[in-house]
A protein has these predicted regions:
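Short, charged, surface-exposed hinge/linker loops at domain edges
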Residues: 1-5, 13, 31-34, 38-69
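Short aromatic-glycine-(Arg/Gly/Cys) micro-motifs in beta-strand/loop hairpins
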Residues: 8-23
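Short, well-ordered beta-strand elements within core beta-sheets of diverse protein domains
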Residues: 26-29
Length: 69
C-alpha cells in the first residue's frame, strides 16, 4: 500500500471536480470531491498495472507571484 497525492480543482461550472495525481500524472473527474478521488484512485491503479511508480521526491505545494498587466 502506498499513500499518493490528490490535487483537486473545481471545474469551471462548479458542477465537476478534477483530480490530479502528480506522482503518476493520472487525472480523473467526478461530480463531487469524493467521486473525483474515487475515480482518480481507479485510474491510478489501472496505470500502475502497466507502469511502475516513478521514483520521485514527495510532492509539495508552494506559492509564487506574477505581475498582472
Amino acid at each position: 500500500m502506498k499513500r499518493l497525492t490528490a490535487v483537486i480543482y473545481p471545474g469551471e461550472t462548479g458542477r465537476w471536480f478534477v483530480a490530479f495525481n502528480p506522482e503518476t500524472g493520472t487525472t480523473s473527474q467526478g461530480r463531487s470531491v469524493e467521486q473525483a478521488v474515487k475515480n482518480l484512485k481507479e485510474a491510478t491503479e489501472l496505470y500502475l498495472e502497466e507502469n511502475e511508480l516513478p521514483e520521485r521526491s514527495p510532492a509539495f505545494l508552494t506559492t509564487f507571484e506574477v505581475a498582472l498587466a
